[in-house]
């Protein structure tokens, strides 16, 4: 019975670790002061940009973008 219990714990950790890693992703965002025309569209399409949208990578003083965490 001891070996089965250890196996269950190992499986639980294997399942939990990826979920914890996902929890460290950038915060969900809502758009604030975002005009898409002010941000070059290519920035929004690049895979390395944050998932929240164009505002994430446009400095407010330069492009009129900006974002804040939800909640």
From Swiss-Prot:
Signal peptide: 1-23
Domain of life assignment: Eukaryota
Modified sites of kind Arginine amide: 70
PTM entry text: The amidated form is probably the active form.
Disulphide bridges, residue numbers: 29-58, 34-54, 39-52, 44-55
Function: Has antibacterial activity, mainly against marine Gram-positive bacteria like C.maltaromaticum (MIC=50 uM), C.mobile (MIC=50 uM), C.divergens (MIC=50 uM) and C.funditum (MIC=25 uM) but also against C.glutamicum (MIC=12.5 uM). Has very little or no activity against Gram-negative bacteria.
Name the UniProt record assigns to this protein: Paralithocin 2
Protein species of origin: Paralithodes camtschaticus (Red king crab)
């Amino acid at each position: 019975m001891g070996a089965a219990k250890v196996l269950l714990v190992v499986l639980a950790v294997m399942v939990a670790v990826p979920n914890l890693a996902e929890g460290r992703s950038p915060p969900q965002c809502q758009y604030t002061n975002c005009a898409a025309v002010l941000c070059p569209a290519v920035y929004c399409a690049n895979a390395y940009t944050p998932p929240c949208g164009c505002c994430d990578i446009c400095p407010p003083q330069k492009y009129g973008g900006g974002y804040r965490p939800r909640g």
